Amino acid sequence: METSMPEYYEVFGEFRGVLMDKRFTKYWEDVEMFLARPDDLVIATYPKSGTTWISEVVYMIYKEGDVEKCKEDAIFNRIPYLECRNEDLINGIKQLKEKESPRIVKTHLPPKLLPASFWEKNCKMIYLCRNAKDVAVSYYYFLLMITSYPNPKSFSEFVEKFMQGQVPYGSWYDHVKAWWEKSKNSRVLFMFYEDMKEDIRREVVKLIEFLERKPSAELVDRIIQHTSFQEMKNNPSTNYTMMPEEMMNQKVSPFMRKGIIGDWKNHFPEALRERFDEHYKQQMKDCTVKFRMEL
């Protein structure tokens, strides 16, 4: 594991207590000074928690169920990724500045790193979370296919880093707890991936109502149909196949991999699971938010 450390920390660095991609923090002033608009909607998640799924659901709500409008461009252009920056290749801030209102903003930032302007303008926010074990599995495969990131080595080694918060965007525990605290504000809707898998209709209606639209049976049906895992996996505008292969090698692992709950059982050996569970209990002992590891 030691041999991977220098390479790993050339790409990622501690930034205000959170491990971040150094390319993102290089121009941090642009993020910090970002000017929100009152009708901006923020979709926040810890990575690999269902970001693309909930983003497409929300976009469908905004477009009143018009599937063709949702297919006009890749989701990473329709809903820019706020802090994402790779010199001039990708610039989430620039994309957002050029967008007409109302904008939908994707971020993986914890609340303390989110531009203050979003709080000052009292923007609505949606936070989607997913159980830690499934996030760890999905994150591992994701890091394998991002060509500019160091190989995460074995799954067990990656889980050790995950538990210590030494993965991009830092500690899952801190991230979830901080957003849970923020959800005391009625402008922040806290949602669970597991709830969406259990009853997507109920959760879509919840989103429509939060966004102050009128839920019709027809609209809900269209959204459910268009945003099913299989539909999105086959849809070039959501499956990230429009992303160049030199950035994302989907031959290593597809961006849309399984989209299920409980896949962690296929990856965690017994001893690792026990260590993870003990660590999880310690980290989450003072937090009232409860997760389901299986349905």
Swiss-Prot record:
Q: Can you tell which superkingdom this protein's organism belongs to?
A: Eukaryota
InterPro entries linked: P-loop_NTPase, Sulfotransferase_dom
Record GO biological process: estrogen metabolic process; female pregnancy; sulfation
State the tissue distribution: Testis and at very low level in the placenta.
Which residues does substrate bind?
K106, T107, H108
UniProt-annotated binding residues for 3'-phosphoadenylyl sulfate: 48-53, 130, 138, 193, 227-232, 257-259
Which Gene Ontology molecular function entries are recorded, alphabetically?
estrone sulfotransferase activity; steroid binding; steroid sulfotransferase activity; sulfotransferase activity
Q: What is the effect of changing K106A?
A: Strongly reduced estrogen sulfotransferase activity. Strongly reduced affinity for estradiol
Q: What is the effect of changing K48M?
A: Loss of estrogen sulfotransferase activity
Q: Which residues carry this modification: Phosphoserine?
A: S156
Q: Which GO terms describe its cellular component?
A: cytoplasm; cytosol
Summarize the activity regulation.
Inhibited by estradiol.
The active site consists of H108 (proton acceptor)
Cellular compartment(s): Cytoplasm, Cytosol
User: What functional role does this protein have?
Assistant: Sulfotransferase that utilizes 3'-phospho-5'-adenylyl sulfate (PAPS) as sulfonate donor to catalyze the sulfate conjugation of estradiol and estrone. Is a key enzyme in estrogen homeostasis, the sulfation of estrogens leads to their inactivation. Also sulfates dehydroepiandrosterone, pregnenolone, (24S)-hydroxycholesterol and xenobiotic compounds like ethinylestradiol, equalenin, diethyl stilbesterol and 1-naphthol at significantly lower efficiency. Does not sulfonate cortisol, testosterone and dopamine. May play a role in gut microbiota-host metabolic interaction.
> What name has this protein been given in UniProt?
Sulfotransferase 1E1
Question: What organism is the protein native to?
Answer: Mus musculus
Gene, per the UniProt record: Sult1e1
